[in-house]
Regions:
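Small/polar/charged residue-enriched interaction surfaces, especially the RNA/DNA-contacting tracks
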Residues: 1-140
Length: 140
């Protein structure tokens, strides 16, 4: 339905798939028991200086998750498409300098995104436009 101003929502152009760890068997061969681990830490109350233990569950180092992002290009508007792909590429680059989830200042949630490329899944797209999209993804 429409919002309070009478505007109708548009469908999202980006669809992010769920990511399931793809290398758990490889990690198990290297001694990892499970895809997550529990780390024991302490927080210290700033006024009373009393330590309080806590447990943080995190994904094990070296875990790999395949990422699929679907961009819905309803009309072939080259300028808009390239701007959107550049924005996505920049966002993924910035994410690699930041973290996902909590406790990033402790080094948790760091990600590396590599081997990213664009391909046409349904319909047709001009090869030159697709090549430009891949250039943008590789550059950022």
């Amino acid at each position: 339905g429409a919002d309070k101003n009478g505007n109708h929502p548009k469908p999202s152009r980006l669809i992010f798939s769920d990511m399931i760890m793809e290398n758990i068997e490889e990690l198990k061969k290297n001694g990892v028991e499970d895809g997550t681990e529990v780390k024991e830490e302490n927080t210290i109350h700033l006024i009373t200086a009393v330590a309080k233990p806590r447990q943080i569950e995190r994904v094990v180092r070296g875990a790999k998750f395949p990422l699929t992002i679907i961009y819905n290009a309803e009309k072939e508007n080259e300028k808009e498409l390239l701007e959107d792909i550049e924005t996505v590429a920049l966002g993924l680059k910035l994410l690699s300098y930041d973290y996902i989830g909590g406790h990033g200042s402790r080094g948790y949630g760091r990600v590396t995104i590599d081997n990213i490329n664009a391909e046409c899944v349904v319909g047709d797209i001009n090869k030159e436009i697709l090549d430009k999209c891949n250039e943008l993804l590789k550059r950022n």
